Amino acid sequence: MQQPHIPVMLNEMLKFLAPKAGESYLDCTFGAGGYSKALLENCDCYVTALDRDPNVIKKAEEIKHNYKDRFDFVETNFGNCFAKLESKKFDGIVLDLGVSSMQLDIPDRGFSFLHDGPLDMRMSGQGLSAEEFINTAEEKDLADVIYKYGDETFSRRIAKKIVEVRKAARIDSTGKLADIVHSCIGFRKGKIDPATKTFQAIRIYINNELGELEQFLANVKNILKKDGRLVVVSFHSLEDRIVKNFFKENSEKPVARSKYAKEDIMLNPDKWLKIITNKAEIPSDKEISLNVRARSAKLRAAKKI
């Protein structure tokens, strides 16, 4: 059964994005439209939303019907959105990284081990599928992906078992892959399902999620107005590290070459961000109790200066 979509850290997103009437905002990860709708309801602002998943278009059309010219939707991944935005600039930009609840809850999408379905995991429906990767990749490559993107200690054991099983029969469903992982790692009381990290790792790899994030951040300066705010919600330590380092590298205070040097002689003259979250914001205990998917979320925000 598909669960109702609950936007993660919605109040915190609105707090740090601080929308104002007449301003324009970019929702880079539309999903079920939770952030876009909240922004449009908050004040008389304008929202452009992006998503590479064609399955969200119907939801986008519903919001377009209700908010008319205040809302636009562009079917694209955010890493390659710049040409399609046609030189638009925004007063605020928000990214809610990772997989959406809609994708997790539809078995045919193949994102979740909780529902048996085709082993797909492609957000756009194009390119290499998880099934193709699982059944053709070298054992070492499987282990590397599961370890790098899932931080899975038992990655080699899992990769070895995958190769062993696929020799007898193709691994073509989420249930089969989950069973393989479960056979390698026992369940521990109070811990997450043993298959969680492996599924996460394969999904991140298949959709080039970290590459998309890095590509977007490298170009975001060009579409953010002065004093515009950038808010990023991440769900994985690798995502959060990329965002944290990007904010730090572009917002460090000017450093003089020596204590006698003039202030305009700096090691970092190109800083353009001011961090407005001293450390990553995390969901409240109440939110986690209402939406377990929020448990690993971290929010960081910065302003263009």
UniProtKB/Swiss-Prot annotation:
One of its GO terms (biological process) is rRNA base methylation. InterPro entries: RsmH (IPR002903), SAM-dep_MeTrfase_MraW_recog (IPR023397), SAM-dependent_MTases_sf (IPR029063). GO terms for cellular component: cytoplasm. It catalyses: cytidine(1402) in 16S rRNA + S-adenosyl-L-methionine = N(4)-methylcytidine(1402) in 16S rRNA + S-adenosyl-L-homocysteine + H(+). Keywords: Cytoplasm, Methyltransferase, rRNA processing, S-adenosyl-L-methionine, Transferase. Gene3D superfamilies: Putative methyltransferase TM0872, insert domain, Vaccinia Virus protein VP39. Its EC number is 2.1.1.199. It is an enzyme of class 2 (transferase). GO terms for molecular function: rRNA (cytosine-N4-)-methyltransferase activity. S-adenosyl-L-methionine binds at residues 33-35, 51, 82, 96, 103. It is found in: Cytoplasm. NCBIfam families: 16S rRNA (cytosine(1402)-N(4))-methyltransferase RsmH. Belongs to the methyltransferase superfamily. RsmH family. HAMAP family: 16SrRNA_methyltr_H (MF_01007). Specifically methylates the N4 position of cytidine in position 1402 (C1402) of 16S rRNA. This is Ribosomal RNA small subunit methyltransferase H. It comes from Rickettsia bellii (strain OSU 85-389). The gene is rsmH.
